[in-house]
Amino acid sequence: MERTWRWFGKKDKITLDMLRQIGVEGIVTALHDVPNGEVWTQEQIRDLREYIEGYGMRWSVVESLPVSEAIKYAGADRDRLIDNYKTSLRNLALEGVKNVCYNFMPVLDWARTDLLHPNANGTSNLYFSHAQFAYFDICILKRPGAETSWPDDVLAEVEKLKATMTPEDDHNLVDTIIVKTQGFVSGNIKEGDEHPVELFRDLLSLYDGITADALRENMRYFLAAIMPVCDEMDIRMCVHPDDPPFQILGLPRIVTCDADIDWFLHAVDNPHNCLTFCAGSLSAGGHNDVVALARKYASRTSFVHLRSCHIFPNGDFTEAGHLGGRANLVELVRIFEKTDPTLPMRVDHGMTMLGDEARGYNAGYSFLGRMFALGQVQGIIATVDNELGLPYRQPGLF
């Protein structure tokens, strides 16, 4: 598998010089300074591609070319935004960048309630608490009817939190759920925005009355519109599963499980309509057999995220070490190496380790934690390649 790394552009505190020393072959990035919905010009793309290539690596995957909210909820501006999207795709392909990761999650790109949850060994990681998320939903966001979305045991925990949460705790929870995890990814709400809760409510209101079936139809419309460009330019569009893979905040989630993946692959049945196989997102749902999904969909996968989650008895989940958790990364690497040993892979997220926390890295995207994980995955790949009789590459040494 091609060893890639998510890099947030020239402003990233992790430099390309650092990455080429740790075995990274390809870069996963985007034009993060271009607002959602605007065209990525060929000149902008070329500038970034050449910058990456100047460090001996290639721009392997776009993550992400964001799908504007108005495309997802079928707003009046949808067709104009899709035309812009097609122009950006064409410009990417003209510069040789032809693997594009995206998602179709409304409003929230991914959700956690704690970005620095302590581990016994002194590291920290990402954590999702149903009770804390429900507290945000009911007591901070005050979403109408929110109480009906949560089971009685979670509501009982919310009552306990009401007695202990301070205004500072509330602020930190808001910052975690709708600012720190979103600003550097979707740009919907950013650091420094005033009244983020009110802005978030406004975004949620755009999806009033949008059912899962309606969102599916909007996804079908989008894919049908862009596939002719993908066919012409040989672009693989690989959708990212919903994170977490269950409904939150009353929003429909339509890429959460086997049936959902099967649906979108057949909704527009085209070899350029592909999957980003995110083992972490899928393993956060107890309903998913991650290895079985990999076996079933490896041939329609054009990008792999390797991480793993552990689910607690109450349904909360945390990022596990890359050798632990539910995902079984050893078997996943074996499946994907057999299918296509050139498939781009990145270690997704990583523990925050001693030396990471003070550096101001984006949530979940530490340097030392991901470097440690990449070393583990390199070992898995070397072992699997030896089993399969494949030559093992040592990137950057010879």
Regions picked out by a protein language model, each given a short descriptive name:
Residues 1-4, 9, 17-20, 70-74, ...:
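Histidine-acidic metal/acid-base catalytic patches
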Residues 9-32, 51-55, 91-100:
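Catalytic domains of carbohydrate-active enzymes, especially glycoside hydrolases
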Residues 12, 39-60:
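Glycine-rich, positively charged N-terminal anion/phosphate-binding segment
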Residues 30-46, 249:
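Glycine-rich, proline-tolerant flexible connector loops at the mouths of alpha/beta enzymes
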Residues 33, 66, 106-107, 244, ...:
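Conserved beta-strand edge residues that scaffold enzyme active sites
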Residues 109-197, 256:
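Aromatic- and acidic-residue-enriched segments that line the glycan-binding/catalytic groove
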